[in-house]
Amino acid sequence: MNSFTLDEIYVGQKASVTKTITRGDLYAFAGLVDDYSPVHIDKAFGEQSPFGRCIAHGFLSGALFSTLAGNYLPGAGSLYVRQSLNFLRPVYAGDTITATFEVVKKGEEVTKPDGTVKFSPGRIVMKA
């Protein structure tokens, strides 16, 4: 776990975290947020959906930004106060995704990171 002070953070600084999404993650996240939509957890329903199989909840991928802020950049003691996401592609069980923050602006009290989630390696799944 990192713990950067505002003085230590610089524009262009990056942090990334990689996770392989499992079927277990889909069920665990559904239980955590009480969202049992069949497109996320029902195999037969997922196969009949436009996606062809179950997809991860968008915020399961988006939660990696909280992981980045709390553990890597800036790390311990940071407050994650705002998030705006664009979901560009579905994420399936078995996909490995990488979330990345890059500091694009630094103020006197806060920094503004840009974030992306990509398939590892590959196309962008989500932008923040």
Give residue spans per PLM region.
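Catalytic strand-loop segment that frames the active site of acyl-thioester-processing enzymes
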Residues: 1-54
